[in-house]
């Protein structure tokens, strides 16, 4: 595994690899790697000649007062995990190399960015779209891999790729869960023991919502049931959203249809957790 820190060098390596006809699979991450990330890497290894992983805690996707400073960082441990998987390149840029003084260009995917998480994290998806756009230009992947846990993010990136004519295939892989159903997330590290136990209610509520939809319940009644489940969990400090949405538009669904997105964002203590299920 070769570690590259300078965007220009990473771009030159990628350009040469593509010129030689090598397919590049790319997994952009913010580090604190867990089994969810590793599953994306394994899939990329199966489908590409070369696998490149980036680790970059992107400041532009954190709003003021969010957890940018305390976001978990352990690059040495991450390197060990990546070496064990025998990836080809780790791209490890610093903030100044990607956002030098005078930087002033951002990518905004209108519409989708203003729904769900976008309501509670203003500017978040502008930061996500911008950094992914930059990374795609540097790494030049044929395929890029994302997890379904960040469903809205993957939808926004697909839209950006389509609208801006990127030659990248976006592959969204299933959410990887702990044994008790909690979606794997770097932010789970923030939870104390009681909060960690409390967090299992998210998946339980999603599964209950799935069951009710499959039994023919109306989406609005499913939403009410999910909120009821969360309100009975004393450690939940705030329910930001929980309900039934259209998987393409992210609009709330009020009538029955063929496919649904069940999605949740809430805070347990100071930790914001998200999760979702697709129901067909």
Curated annotation (Swiss-Prot):
Disulfide bonds: none annotated. CDD domains: PanC (cd00560). One of its GO terms (molecular function) is pantoate-beta-alanine ligase activity. It is found in: Cytoplasm. The keyword Nucleotide-binding applies. Pathway: Cofactor biosynthesis; (R)-pantothenate biosynthesis; (R)-pantothenate from (R)-pantoate and beta-alanine: step 1/1. Its EC number is 6.3.2.1. ATP binds at residues 30-37, 147-150, 176, 184-187. Beta-alanine binds at residue 61. GO terms for cellular component: cytosol. (R)-pantoate binds at residues 61, 153. Homodimer. The reaction proceeds by a bi uni uni bi ping pong mechanism. Belongs to the pantothenate synthetase family. Catalyzes the condensation of pantoate with beta-alanine in an ATP-dependent reaction via a pantoyl-adenylate intermediate. This is Pantothenate synthetase. It comes from Thermodesulfovibrio yellowstonii (strain ATCC 51303 / DSM 11347 / YP87).
